[in-house]
A protein has these predicted regions:
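Short, solvent-exposed loop/turn segments at secondary-structure junctions
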Residues: 21, 45-46, 92-93, 119-121
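Generic hydrophobic/packing signal
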Residues: 17-18, 90, 112-115
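Conserved catalytic core of nucleotide-sugar-dependent glycosyltransferases
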Residues: 84, 94-140
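Short, flexible loop segments at the rims of nucleotide/cofactor-binding pockets, characterized by
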Residues: 62-63, 91-93
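N-terminal anchoring/stem segment of glycosyltransferases
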Residues: 1-84, 98
């Protein structure tokens, strides 16, 4: 698995392990709000399936976190050119506007670690991970 050099086009990076039912295509719209590079590590049966919509198109075996570990190792110092990195699950339904907003809050608040809240209709086991309409940001 090799990665091309960082293009410097965008401030943020999303690294996602994706299969044939990934929802990541919604992350790229509307295009005018896309402020991130997208690195997809595909584990399905159709190599190159998502190559057109991402900046880094990889195929690798193994679990989500072992694949992300390999990507991080290969990107090396190029990771430091990004202001923030997000490693979402492929099953998250969102769009470029909300991702842009998430990254803006992250950098505006100088956070070192963060995650977006889930919508009220999400399948989750922890109540504190669900959106609360009165908050922009919560510390836990």
């Amino acid at each position: 698995m090799s990665l091309p050099a960082h293009t410097g086009r965008r401030k943020y990076l999303i690294i996602a392990r994706v299969g044939d039912n990934s929802l990541h295509a919604s992350w790229l719209e509307p295009k005018e709000f896309r402020n991130f590079d997208l690195c997809l590590c595909y584990y399905g049966d159709h190599p190159g399936r998502y190559g057109g919509g991402c900046d880094y198109d990889l195929k690798d075996e193994g679990s989500k976190w072992s694949a992300i570990k390999q990507i991080v190792k290969r990107l090396g110092d190029d990771l430091f050119q990004y202001e923030a990195i997000w490693c979402p699950d492929e099953s998250l339904q969102t769009d470029a506007f909300n991702i842009n907003r998430m990254f803006h809050i992250f950098t505006d608040q100088a956070l070192w670690l963060a995650q977006p809240a889930l919508s009220a209709d999400s399948d989750c086991s922890r109540r504190e991970t669900v959106q609360h309409p009165e908050y922009i940001l919560r510390y836990t």
